[in-house]
A protein has these predicted regions:
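Structural preference for beta-rich elements and adjacent junctions enriched in aromatics
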Residues: 1-274, 283
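Transmembrane beta-strands of outer-membrane beta-barrel pores
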Residues: 14, 56, 79, 121-127, ...
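Short loop/turn motifs that connect adjacent beta-strands in outer-membrane beta-barrel proteins
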Residues: 59-69, 107-114, 147, 247, ...
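Residues on the lipid-exposed face of transmembrane beta-strands in outer-membrane beta-barrel proteins
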Residues: 107, 119, 138-142, 239-243, ...
């Protein structure tokens, strides 16, 4: 839509393998999205070319009156043999201002609709128990061509989805897994409210269809309940509807899990609204999770801002609030990025998550009860004299301090890294870190008998 709200990337290699991604908040990349498009390449004697077919309905777009519409665009070629890229605009996806720097492009305006239906029927039979399972359902994707889009999944079957990588995690921090189910990756960028480095996600769609709620002590056949615990829940229904207007975007998401013999499915709801001002975006997201088995519910509210009105400065912030039966939590994250040119960048940030903040019923929170200050400097150079051996240099220094909300300070830290890329395709990575002494409450899980471990200087 040309308002630097979200960008979509389409990539094809010489072997015709495809990749796509979305970019928000400057250059926050997500590879979860899987668009409906195709591309092919042709290799000649001393050249190769590529051709992309991107349907007009591949992404939701605002309705525009008139014969022309404005978009932002970049064409990029990566020469893997030389590890070198060529772009139609002087920017790339590693820069914090990537989608703000794209060139305006005026194209013919079209309006088209696309309605897609994917019914399914599966039959499974166990030859030992002679049990037979039949399932039928349908996925519906409706692009109305006026900036609104509706996705519906009735009794969906996610059995064909690729499995996650095996992760052995003994830490107190939950491993975050990205979404792979097409229904939840399609048309989802409006609902993405997240912190940097996976600090938090207000909506983590992997919770939907997750492990059911159990309390086997409620049942006389508790041993049968224990032996039949499932790691996932089937879905009865999922619905998402989004509307894109000139000044505001709106979205609604709902999902309902199936009941089973020893549990009842949960219900999930989310409502999203966001302004479309190119220089000052303000959004609000509300979620509700209802546990029908425990007869409990949880609510989360978030307010997010993204401001680029001040020259060379990007300001982003989030206010978080969670409410459960007996607790209310609060959170704040704030970042200021100063980018005077393509060689230097400075980020100053702060976040505060109190001990009662809980996003994990429908979202993801890496850890609560934490205060963090950080400052990051980046020094890049992408051009050197012809006689120089170097092609580029990327350097950054990070300074940080974390503590619990009651003042237990973790070690202060300094981390620096430099990446040197030579014209001979030889690369050198140099890194160094140093920490002061401090208290680590993460290792002991804040056990009352040993609330922290004293960490010495490193």
């Amino acid at each position: 839509d040309g308002n630097s709200k979200v960008a979509y990337g389409f990539t094809v290699s010489l072997g015709d393998s495809l990749a796509d991604a979305t970019y928000t908040n400057g250059n926050s990349e997500s590879k979860d999205w899987d668009g409906d498009w195709i591309a092919r390449t042709f290799k000649g004697n001393n050249f190769w070319s590529s051709e992309f077919f991107i349907p007009w309905t591949v992404v939701p777009m605002q309705k525009v009156d008139g014969p022309k519409r404005n978009v932002k665009f970049i064409a990029f070629r990566w020469l893997a043999s030389d590890e070198f890229g060529f772009g139609s605009t002087k920017t790339n996806w590693e820069r914090e201002t990537f989608i703000y720097d794209l060139e305006d492009l005026v194209i013919d305006n079209y309006q088209s609709k696309k309605y897609s239906y994917f019914p399914y029927l599966t039959v499974a039979e166990d030859s030992v128990t002679n049990e037979s399972i039949q399932k039928a359902g349908i996925d519906i994707f409706l692009n109305h061509g006026d900036g609104s889009q509706t996705n519906i999944a009735i009794n969906p079957d996610f059995g064909q989805v690729e499995t996650d990588q095996v992760v052995v995690n003994f830490s107190a921090i939950e491993t975050f897994f990205s979404e792979k189910r097409a229904f939840f990756t399609e048309n989802h960028s409006l609902f993405e409210v997240k912190g940097g480095r996976d600090d938090f996600y207000v909506i983590n769609t992997r919770r939907i269809g997750g492990r059911p709620d159990y309390d086997c002590s409620r049942f006389e056949q508790s041993d049968i309940c224990e032996n039949n615990r499932k790691e996932y829940s089937d879905l009865d229904l999922a619905l998402r509807h989004t509307i894109q207007k000139e000044k505001v975007d709106l979205g609604f998401l709902a999902a309902s899990e199936s009941d089973e013999n020893f549990s009842k499915g949960r219900d999930y709801f989310a409502f999203r609204v966001r302004s479309n001002s190119p220089q000052n975006k303000v959004g609000f997201l509300a979620t509700k999770t209802k546990s029908n088995f425990f007869n409990e519910s949880s609510d989360v509210y978030s307010l997010d801002i993204e401001n680029t009105a001040v020259k060379n400065t990007q300001i982003s912030g989030y206010l978080l609030n969670s409410r459960k039966e007996n607790s209310t939590g609060h959170g704040l994250r704030f970042d200021i990025k100063y980018i005077p040119n393509d060689k230097y960048e400075n980020t100053v940030g702060f976040h505060y998550f109190d001990k009662d903040l809980d996003l994990n019923d429908m979202g993801y929170l890496q850890r609560n009860d934490q205060i963090k200050f950080y400052n990051r400097f980046e020094f890049d150079r992408n051009s050197y004299p012809k006689e120089s051996l170097l092609r580029s240099r990327d350097s950054h220094i990070s300074i940080f301090q974390t503590m619990t909300t009651d003042g237990k300070k973790s070690p202060k830290g300094v981390w620096t890294k430099t990446e040197l890329s030579f014209k001979s395709n030889f690369n050198i990575d140099l890194s160094m870190s140093a920490k002061t002494e401090g208290k680590d409450t993460n290792i002991t899980r804040k056990y009352i008998g040993s609330p922290y471990i004293q960490i010495m200087d490193e």
